[in-house]
């Protein structure tokens, strides 16, 4: 039976067989040093929008409203252009609005104040909603932002808010505005303020250890669009498969810092680390339960790679599976009642589901020759994404649990694997080699709008914060 290893090693793929990185990490097989203040704090809103502003802007019948986001009016530097571009990108990401391209605004007069907004010119351009914003810098470290969303037809204000705080958080203000507009106009939880964590070799370092010339990989985090990437670990060892805690304040991952795989948790605001498995056996691929109190992971502590569940602090350990095969890559259902995972008990890796109590095991994928690395969607979607062998490569597929059907969302552009859902379930992050190196991409759940997130080095196994 393939992949039957009693101890994870950093060997290369068997001749003639290319094994997806996620399953390879499971049978091969982060931590530490996150500085205090690694993540920027959210900007402060200057009070809630007036209660009478509840206008929802619509487009022509059967079409989304057309939005325009020109540069904010700024008293210094490129702050206004940055806010305008980032906000446009954020609103465009969710596809709830048709975003009128910014390069078509050249003929529109620039408004220096809200009472100068040229509604007639915007209407002639076919715009339904326009953002007007200003940004001031009262001192070197502070910005003050005002933003209004106008209904171009009625000239009424549909959204208005003020923000103030650190000038270093300029992009975060734009993300916040986008999420609040999506919430107010579409009752949609946007993802502009969310973050991705991933493993990367971008530091290009090498170390000698139990496995010679092993590539160093560290854990990184970045904004959902790839901006503001920063390093979480500095162990100069192999650190892989990071996952977020539900409160987005901690990252659990697998680290080879001791020469074998073990589970660590980086507390990213405190700059501290935890090691809940405490070096007992070899442990890898942790994942938090939806309430954050438990961790499911793979361990060979009893001689074979099996799934275990423990409390976050390492107490309450119990074994979930008991099979001679390899059971790995767990993912929790949104209600915490079930766990999907990869097992090669049928001869090739396939996706299975088991109750969180270890009962009611069933095989999910039956039409795939090879299926790996499941990830369970958040509500209201009821589906599991996974990587599947397709011809000579690997692509992302989605299994609809209600309908019992599978759809494919990537199609032969390199190797595509390690999917991870956004917290609103509308997007997936994944690893792809379509550009010639391993990079993180995002894609809508219907397979449209693939976007490259990382470019520096090689990047692997993304996870999306709440």
Could you say what each language-model-derived stretch is?
Residues 189, 200-218, 234-238, 254-264, ...:
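A flexible loop/linker signature enriched in serine peptidases of the S9 family
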Residues 24-37:
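Bacterial N-terminal signal peptides
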Residues 49-118, 131-137:
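Short beta-strand->alpha-helix linker/helix-N-cap micro-motif
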Residues 153, 223-227, 267-271, 311-315, ...:
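Short loop/turn segments that connect beta-strands within beta-propeller blades
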Residues 243, 287, 331, 375-377, ...:
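Conserved beta-strand position repeated across blades of beta-propeller domains
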């Amino acid at each position: 039976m393939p992949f039957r290893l009693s101890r994870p090693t950093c060997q290369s793929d068997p001749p003639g067989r290319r094994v997806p990185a996620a399953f390879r990490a499971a049978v091969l097989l982060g931590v530490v040093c996150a500085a205090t203040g690694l993540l920027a704090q959210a900007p402060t809103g200057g009070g809630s929008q007036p209660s009478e502003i509840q206008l929802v802007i619509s487009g022509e019948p059967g079409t989304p409203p057309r939005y325009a986001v020109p540069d904010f009016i700024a008293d210094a530097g490129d702050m206004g252009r940055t806010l305008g571009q980032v906000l446009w990108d954020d609103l465009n990401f969710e596809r709830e609005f048709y975003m009128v391209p910014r390069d078509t605004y050249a003929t529109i007069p620039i408004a220096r104040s809200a009472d100068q907004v040229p509604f007639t010119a915007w209407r002639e351009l076919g715009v339904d909603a326009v953002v007007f914003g200003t940004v001031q810098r009262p001192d070197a470290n502070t910005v003050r932002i005002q933003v209004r969303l106008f209904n171009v037809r009625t000239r009424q204000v549909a959204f208005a808010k003020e923000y103030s705080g650190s000038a270093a958080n300029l992009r975060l203000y734009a993300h916040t505005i986008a999420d609040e507009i999506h919430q107010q106009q579409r009752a949609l939880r946007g993802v502009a303020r969310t973050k991705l964590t991933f493993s990367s070799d971008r530091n290009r370092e090498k170390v000698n250890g139990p496995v010679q010339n092993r590539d160093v990989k560290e854990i990184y985090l970045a904004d959902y669009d790839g901006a503001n990437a920063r390093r979480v670990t500095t162990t100069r060892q192999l650190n892989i498969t990071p996952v977020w805690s539900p409160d987005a304040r901690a990252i659990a991952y697998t680290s080879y810092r001791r020469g074998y795989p073990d589970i660590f948790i980086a507390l990213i605001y405190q700059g501290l680390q935890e090691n809940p498995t405490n070096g007992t056996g070899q442990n890898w691929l942790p994942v938090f339960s939806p309430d954050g109190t438990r961790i499911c992971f793979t361990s060979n502590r009893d001689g074979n790679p099996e799934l275990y569940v423990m409390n976050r602090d390492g107490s309450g350990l119990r074994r979930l599976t008991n099979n001679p095969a390899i059971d790995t890559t767990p993912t929790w259902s949104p209600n915490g009642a079930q766990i999907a995972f990869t097992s090669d008990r049928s001869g090739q890796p396939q996706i299975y589901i088991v109750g969180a109590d270890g009962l009611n095991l069933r095989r999910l994928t039956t039409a795939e020759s090879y299926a790996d690395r499941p990830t369970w969607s958040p509500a209201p979607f009821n589906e599991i994404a996974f990587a599947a062998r397709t011809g000579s490569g690997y692509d992302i597929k989605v299994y609809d649990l209600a309908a019992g059907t599978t759809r494919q969302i990537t199609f032969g552009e390199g190797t595509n694997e390690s999917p991870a859902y956004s917290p609103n379930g509308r997007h997936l992050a994944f690893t792809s080699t379509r550009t010639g190196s391993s990079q993180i991409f995002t894609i809508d759940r219907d397979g449209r709008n693939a976007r490259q997130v990382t470019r520096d080095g090689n990047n692997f196994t993304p996870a999306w914060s709440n």
